[in-house]
Amino acid sequence: MRLISWNVNGLRACLNKGFLAFCALADADVICLQETKMRPEQAQFELEGYHRFWNSADKAGYSGTAVFTRREPLAVTYDFGEDIHRHEGRVITAEYEDFFLVCCYTPNSKDQLARLDYRMAWEDDLREYLLELDAKKPVVYCGDLNVAHQEIDLKNPQSNRMNPGFSDEERDKMTQLLSSGFVDTFRALYPKRTGAYSWWSCRFHARENNAGWRIDYFIVSARLMPRVKNADIWPEITGSDHCPVVLELTE
């Protein structure tokens, strides 16, 4: 079973940059998208063989997630927790027979960490939500999680020490999640792989120089790890400032 997660940075723009051709070649069972920036009624394209689920922000052209899945889920829910988390279209949960899939676009802490307090509340509430799901069946949690967990996960850790996405507070929240029974699949399989990034700034020729960050993840319940065949990053796929990340599971 192949699952793909990709922050497309605006799906309408990505559609003009080869998105449908990518989907055909990727042959994924599940495609999770973040930052779609569109509503379902704007999706004027065909993706044969997939059930499509959308969660759009109240604010037009902002945030948003989608899940395209060949296997019809048992149930699909949108957002989680308190009302404060229910206006930006950031989470879709699909329940399958043997696991929950959670597609997430984590809020950015913003310049000068202006939104850090909200981010911390989000992380605590989402971790509680994931643990509630995990008590029922294993969880596959994926998306743009807006944090580089370790120094190996970005090109320039020292100069980004207190920037959004690499603050001590954000990294500590990821550590807490991984200490509560979840596994970062890519880093578990490739603990020493350097230069493996999923996002690059649009400035300073960052992508050409591979001056990137690994902020897109597949994180799974620890007991699901025996089913993990591979977890990878596909930096050769363009169309967004992020690239897709992939998880392959045995059936």
Identify the meaning behind each predicted range.
Residues 1-47, 57-63, 78:
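N-terminal, active-site-proximal structural segment of metallo-dependent hydrolase catalytic domains
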Residues 37, 43-109:
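Structured beta-strand-rich core segments of catalytic domains in phosphoester-bond hydrolases
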Residues 70, 94-97, 221-222, 247-251:
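Active-site beta-strand termini and strand-to-loop segments that position acidic
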Residues 81-82, 107-123, 158-162:
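Surface-exposed cleft-lining segments at the edges of enzyme active sites
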Residues 30, 51, 122-211, 215:
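Metal-dependent phosphoesterases centered on the DNase I-like endonuclease/exonuclease/phosphatase
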Residues 60-75, 203-226:
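Conserved beta strand-loop-helix elements of the APE1-like EEP
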Residues 1-9, 98-110, 142:
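Active-site-proximal beta-strand elements of phosphoester/diester hydrolases
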